[in-house]
């Protein structure tokens, strides 16, 4: 069976990744892409890798009826347009933060409130490794934040294996590429200002903390740095377990959680150049790399995870979740394994 799909907000970076994935997906027919600023231009005008397509951007006011609508719009748009989205499609996958959290109180604390709070309990978080069963048949799906996704994937096995209880001190440092700022950018995203930086841009209070709290049930000390790469999110989690932990315990926890997951790979101190997770290794793919190292002298466990922020942290996660929701093979349209060697991701 072939499902029709549309992308609302298709001219941005994440929208472009959605268009790329859907264009090559064996079970989706890309029916529409909207952009207010690029209306009537071909999608290749914004995304040169899609110049082969004749599809043109249409107005977001003229939504066509499709099976699945992917919304790659700024925060606040989807909650205002959700009625139109759901009228146009049986399944809506939102890539903004509008439906990620479970309660109105959380949006009051972390964002600027929510205009459609009754829909929050109907939404399902899009990370299949965390929420697969609830995604099956879901009609409103919220793709997770890239920094939260990297952190959750790194820490989840430790909680599932009861290595951590939630009372431990956990310090998370995330380094992200410039594409996280979107195609619109701003002064801080211009090449002269961004090139060569290791810039703390959210030392405390990053909104993705709310997702980590919600799904792992913990508070973390969370800091995000902007670094000189285009794609990628790399999370380094410093954990101080209350109990003694061995390498065997860790291998058992991570293999037990991820051995059957098609998009998560364990990379933990092996040979070669790429001994631990790196964004460069997963650029352009829906894969996540997860690894760890023990520091027994300081009673510390260091957990690493790396994803492409626009793929596993956004568009790839969204398509993966849609596959699960519709009963499509999970890896469909997401088989690309990346390139090596490559330049800065």
Curated annotation (Swiss-Prot):
EC number: 1.2.1.103, 1.2.1.106
UniProt: NADP(+) binding residues: 11-14, 309
Pathways per UniProt: Amino-acid biosynthesis; L-lysine biosynthesis via AAA pathway; L-lysine from L-alpha-aminoadipate (Thermus route): step 3/5; Amino-acid biosynthesis; L-arginine biosynthesis
Active site, renumbered: 146
Subcellular location: Cytoplasm
GO cellular component: cytoplasm
Alphabetized GO MF terms: N-acetyl-gamma-aminoadipyl-phosphate reductase activity; N-acetyl-gamma-glutamyl-phosphate reductase activity; NAD binding; NADP+ binding
Catalytic activity, as annotated: [amino-group carrier protein]-C-terminal-N-(1-carboxy-5-oxopentan-1-yl)-L-glutamine + phosphate + NADP(+) = [amino-group carrier protein]-C-terminal-N-(1-carboxy-5-phosphooxy-5-oxopentan-1-yl)-L-glutamine + NADPH + H(+); [amino-group carrier protein]-C-terminal-gamma-(L-glutamyl-5-semialdehyde)-L-glutamate + phosphate + NADP(+) = [amino-group carrier protein]-C-terminal-gamma-(5-phospho-L-glutamyl)-L-glutamate + NADPH + H(+)
Region of interest (Disordered), residue spans: 34-56
Pfam families: Semialdhyde_dh, Semialdhyde_dhC_1
Main location: cytoplasm
A single GO BP: arginine biosynthetic process via ornithine
Keyword Transport in record: no
Keyword flag Hydrolase: no
Gene3D superfamilies, per the entry: Dihydrodipicolinate Reductase, domain 2, NAD(P)-binding Rossmann-like Domain
Alphabetized UniProt keyword annotations: Amino-acid biosynthesis, Arginine biosynthesis, Cytoplasm, Lysine biosynthesis, NADP, Oxidoreductase
Record PANTHER family: [LYSW]-L-2-AMINOADIPATE_[LYSW]-L-GLUTAMATE PHOSPHATE REDUCTASE-RELATED, N-ACETYL-GAMMA-GLUTAMYL-PHOSPHATE REDUCTASE, CHLOROPLASTIC-RELATED-RELATED
Function comment: Involved in both the arginine and lysine biosynthetic pathways.
Family the UniProt entry places it in: Belongs to the NAGSA dehydrogenase family. Type 1 subfamily. LysY sub-subfamily.
Identification of the protein by name: Putative [LysW]-L-2-aminoadipate/[LysW]-L-glutamate phosphate reductase
The species this protein was found in: Haloarcula marismortui (strain ATCC 43049 / DSM 3752 / JCM 8966 / VKM B-1809) (Halobacterium marismortui)
């Amino acid at each position: 069976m072939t499902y029709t799909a549309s992308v609302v907000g298709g001219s941005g970076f994440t929208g472009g990744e959605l268009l790329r994935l859907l264009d090559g997906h064996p079970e989706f027919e890309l029916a529409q892409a909207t952009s207010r600023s690029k209306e009537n231009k071909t999608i290749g005008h914004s995304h040169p890798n899609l110049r082969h397509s004749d599809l043109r951007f249409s107005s977001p006011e003229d939504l066509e009826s499709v099976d699945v609508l992917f919304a790659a719009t700024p925060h606040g748009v989807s909650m205002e347009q959700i009625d139109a989205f759901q009228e146009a499609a049986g399944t809506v996958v939102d890539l903004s933060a509008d439906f990620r959290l479970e309660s109105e109180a959380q949006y009051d604390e972390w964002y600027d409130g929510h205009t459609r709070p009754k829909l929050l309990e109907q939404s399902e978080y899009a990370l299949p490794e965390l929420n697969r069963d609830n995604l099956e048949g879901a009609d409103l799906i919220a793709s997770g934040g890239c920094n939260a996704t990297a952190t959750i994937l790194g820490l989840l096995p430790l909680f599932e294996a009861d290595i951590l209880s939630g009372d431990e001190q956990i310090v998370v440092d995330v380094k992200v590429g410039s594409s996280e700022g979107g195609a619109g950018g701003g002064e801080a995203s211009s090449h002269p200002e961004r090139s060569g930086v290791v810039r703390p841009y959210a030392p405390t209070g990053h909104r993705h903390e709310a997702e980590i709290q919600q799904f792992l049930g913990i508070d973390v000390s969370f800091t995000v740095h902007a670094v000189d790469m285009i794609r990628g999110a790399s999370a380094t989690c410093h954990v101080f377990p209350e109990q003694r932990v061995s390498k065997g315990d860790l291998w058992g926890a991570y293999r037990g959680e991820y051995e059957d997951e098609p998009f998560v790979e364990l990379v933990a101190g092996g040979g070669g150049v790429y001994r631990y997770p790196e964004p460069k290794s997963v650029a352009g793919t829906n894969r996540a790399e997860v690894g760890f190292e023990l520091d027994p002298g300081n009673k510390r466990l260091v957990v690493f995870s790396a994803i492409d922020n626009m793929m596993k942290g956004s568009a790839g996660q969204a398509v993966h979740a849609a596959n699960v929701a519709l009963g499509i093979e999970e890896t469909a349209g997401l088989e690309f394994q990346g390139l090596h060697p490559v330049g800065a991701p």
